[in-house]
A protein has these predicted regions:
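Beta-strand-rich recognition/accessory modules
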Residues: 16-27, 32-34, 104-110, 186-253
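Acidic-aromatic substrate-binding/catalytic surfaces of carbohydrate-active enzymes
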Residues: 28-81
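Active-site/ligand-binding surface loops and adjacent short beta/alpha elements
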Residues: 143-205, 210
Length: 253
């Protein structure tokens, strides 16, 4: 458990973060309750995710690396009511259950419009080659709620050249974000790191990197930057219902 203090002239805040390490043979996953982050991921002894760290971006210091969930939306909100990628990555999650190779987290937010929503995150290492992330949106209210989530993994990539579903890309030229559709299965290769990614309800990938570290992102989303456009019916979770989003990363080589 880590304790962080934020000092200000008017107040002092203490944030307690719990870090958990999941294991399955040579696979390890470090999970952080602050933001529901995966701070690091190693499959079969290979570093799959660039470890979460602080990097300098211009005059700012920003978190990069690992993987976080984007909820209730991936990307910006045109009405500016919600922060970039929503509030999941800046919230403190509660542990629901924990075993050697899996963990369940829960978040109940006071964000306007989402007061009756319970967000469930499940991370697991089913074997030493695979990692699974599942987001379940539970709407216990009467009214439908709008969601268009995603996962934001930073894959380890020393070079800029990579391959996505057989098409070549250069990370130096995707800082604007390239959106690519890929139903269910995607095949990605970074510097010899070959991955299969299988998803559920996340058919649009955001390919992005700012190259402020040795990482490139291939992010499965529901509809990309959906909150920049008018709402559509498929983005809503009805009252007293649930919707599930999932991704499985499998190390191929």
């Amino acid at each position: 458990m880590l304790e962080c203090y934020i000092n200000d002239k008017q107040f002092e805040t203490q944030i307690i973060m719990t870090e958990i390490i999941l294991r399955n043979q040579s696979a390890t996953m470090q999970v952080n309750t602050m933001g529901g982050y995966i701070d690091s991921l190693i499959l079969k002894g290979r570093e799959v995710l660039f470890p979460k760290t602080s990097v300098h971006v211009g005059d700012d210091t920003k978190l990069r690396g690992g993987m976080h969930v984007c909820l209730p939306q991936f990307g910006p909100d045109s009405k500016n009511h919600l922060a970039q990628h929503g509030f999941g990555r800046t919230s403190d999650w509660e542990i629901r259950h924990q075993n050697e190779s899996d963990i369940g987290l829960k978040l109940i937010s006071t964000e306007k419009g989402y007061e009756h929503v319970e967000w469930l995150l499940d991370y697991s290492l089913p074997n030493e080659n695979e990692a699974i992330a599942i987001l379940t949106v539970c709407n216990y209210g009467e009214s439908p709620v709008r969601t268009s989530p995603g996962f934001h993994p930073y894959f380890t990539a020393a070079g800029t050249q990579f391959d996505f579903n057989g098409a070549p890309y250069d990370a130096d030229y995707i800082s604007h974000t390239e959106f690519v559709s890929s139903d269910q299965d995607a095949h990605v290769a970074f510097d010899g790191l070959k991955l299969d990614i299988r998803t559920h309800n996340l058919p649009v990938y955001a390919l992005w990197s700012d190259r402020n570290g040795q990482y490139t992102c291939a992010e499965p989303t529901a509809e990309g930057n959906a909150f920049l456009s008018p709402a559509r019916g498929g983005q809503f979770v009805s009252g007293h219902s649930k919707k599930r989003y999932a991704m499985k990363i499998r190390l191929m080589a």
